[in-house]
């Protein structure tokens, strides 16, 4: 989610040296535009370049930094209704010698959106594989990272394309049968009983609903100005019809437990990261994965909700870096035996 937009004030007030009066005027009148400027600035500051690739008539939008080298490239898959720039807060703390790729998931941001496309988890896995082939990422094995919906896709991808993957990081992934029901899943059951699909907490259409969504997704309670909330909603509203279509594809029987059905096929070294106070997808899902993926590492973050990437970016980056380093050390030791 877009919790790191709060940093926008520091960026606009100091780093960008925008005159205070102009900033205040823009903030009051065009909050959505400022949010886009915020992401543009951080992409430039972190060296993430926006690029496009094609597979047939299908276009993918992604950002990347660096080039493939001795270390495995890292492909990062975002969650439901987010975009490639949600990873910027983590990229900030990742080593600059890593080759990073952050792609807009099918139908999101700059990647092709079509009402005829298959947005089920298997459909998205197929598209991500097409993206990987379109940029030649699987010429060598790579590290795959996914959060929430992206974690579901990443896990199923690793199960279906094991020769592409060197290692895997799943951050509070969807697609499991959770032993403990979360607040959000209880909310969904209530909607199913009432037949009301217009009040999905992850698809806000007002500033108030946006605030409710952020409270659901984050353990940290930020006091966010109404202008920022309105800006976040204004950016999302034109896409809400698509988000609703996508959401229905994800909760359909075809996708609801996709990761659960494929997790025993995952053979790559796997790391699980989960916020202990996750109200969207309960942390008990980590136990489910640990019981099926041999030797996987589980990291539970205290005082952290579903938006792990935004709430704990430095910690997330460190855990991933340490995991990759440990795998590299193991590989080096094997070579010297």
UniProtKB/Swiss-Prot annotation:
List of catalytic residues: 148 (nucleophile), 278 (charge relay system), 306 (charge relay system)
Key words of the record: Endosome, Hydrolase, Lipid metabolism, Lysosome, Membrane, Mitochondrion, Signal-anchor, Transmembrane, Transmembrane helix
Residue intervals annotated with topology Cytoplasmic: 43-337
Record-annotated membrane-spanning stretches: 20-42
Cross-referenced SUPFAM superfamilies: alpha/beta-Hydrolases (SSF53474)
The AB hydrolase-1 domain, residue ranges: 73-313
Catalysis performed (reactions): Hydrolyzes glycerol monoesters of long-chain fatty acids; 1-octanoylglycerol + H2O = octanoate + glycerol + H(+); 1-decanoylglycerol + H2O = decanoate + glycerol + H(+); 1-dodecanoylglycerol + H2O = dodecanoate + glycerol + H(+)
Extracellular side: 1-19
Subcellular localization: Late endosome membrane; Lysosome membrane; Mitochondrion membrane
GO cellular component, as recorded: AMPA glutamate receptor complex; late endosome membrane; lysosomal membrane; membrane; mitochondrial membrane
Principal localisation: membrane
Keyword Cell cycle annotated: no
Family the entry assigns: Belongs to the AB hydrolase superfamily.
Function summary: Lipase that preferentially hydrolysis medium-chain saturated monoacylglycerols including 2-arachidonoylglycerol. Through 2-arachidonoylglycerol degradation may regulate endocannabinoid signaling pathways. Also has a lysophosphatidyl lipase activity with a preference for lysophosphatidylglycerol among other lysophospholipids. Also able to degrade bis(monoacylglycero)phosphate (BMP) and constitutes the major enzyme for BMP catabolism.
Protein name, UniProt field: Monoacylglycerol lipase abhd6-A
Species of provenance: Xenopus laevis
Lineage: Eukaryota, Metazoa, Chordata, Craniata, Vertebrata
């Amino acid at each position: 989610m877009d919790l790191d937009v709060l940093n926008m004030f520091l960026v606009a007030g100091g780093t960008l040296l925008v005159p205070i009066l102009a900033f205040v005027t823009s903030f009051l009148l065009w909050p959505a535009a400022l949010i886009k400027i915020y992401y543009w600035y951080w992409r430039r500051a972190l060296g993430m370049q926006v690029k496009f690739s094609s597979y047939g008539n299908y276009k993918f939008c992604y950002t990347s930094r660096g080039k493939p080298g001795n270390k495995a490239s890292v492909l990062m898959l975002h969650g439901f209704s987010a975009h490639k720039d949600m990873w910027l807060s983590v990229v900030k703390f990742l080593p600059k010698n890593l080759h990073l790729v952050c792609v807009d998931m099918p139908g999101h941001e700059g990647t092709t959106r079509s009402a005829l496309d298959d947005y089920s988890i298997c459909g998205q896995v197929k598209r991500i594989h097409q993206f990987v082939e379109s940029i030649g990422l699987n010429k060598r094995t790579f590290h795959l990272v996914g959060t929430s919906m992206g974690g579901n896709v990443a896990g199923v991808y690793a199960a279906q394309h094991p020769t592409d993957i060197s290692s895997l990081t799943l951050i509070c992934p969807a697609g499991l049968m959770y032993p403990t029901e979360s607040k959000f899943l209880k909310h969904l059951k209530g909607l199913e009983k009432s037949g009301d699909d217009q009040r999905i907490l992850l698809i806000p259409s007002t500033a108030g609903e946006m605030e409710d969504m952020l409270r659901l997704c984050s353990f940290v309670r930020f006091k966010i100005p109404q202008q920022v909330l309105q800006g976040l909603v204004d950016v999302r509203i034109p896409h809400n019809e698509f988000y609703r279509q996508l959401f229905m594809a994800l909760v359909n029987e075809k996708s609801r437990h996709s990761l659960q059905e494929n997790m025993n096929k995952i053979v790559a070294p796997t790391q699980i990261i989960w916020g202990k106070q996750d109200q969207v997808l309960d942390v008990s899902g980590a136990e489910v994965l640990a019981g099926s993926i041999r030797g996987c590492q589980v990291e539970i973050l205290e005082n952290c909700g579903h938006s792990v990437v935004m709430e704990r970016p430095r910690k997330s980056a460190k855990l991933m870096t340490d995991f990759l380093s440990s795998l590299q050390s193991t590989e080096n030791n094997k070579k010297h035996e």
